[in-house]
Amino acid sequence: MPEVINRAMALTGTFEDISFAELLQLLNVSHKSGKLSCWRGTERAELHILGGEVARAVSRRERGPEVVYRVLGWKTGEFSF
């Protein structure tokens, strides 16, 4: 289960506990803003969330919606918001 670290909505967890799609839905419904870092092995993705919407997404190889689509396919990995 994801762990809330403090009142500033620091949230960490694994995609085994909550899927990337569920995490995006949680951030959207709660209109959160911040940086969502995702990683799996050597793969990294960084998403900037503004009012619950993905405003920017980057990885080492891609930018934009392709990053979101790639991470949607991850069944394992970790995240921090």
Model-flagged regions — what are they?
Residues 1-81:
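Acidic, Ser/Thr/Pro-enriched low-complexity segments and adjacent helix/loop capping patches
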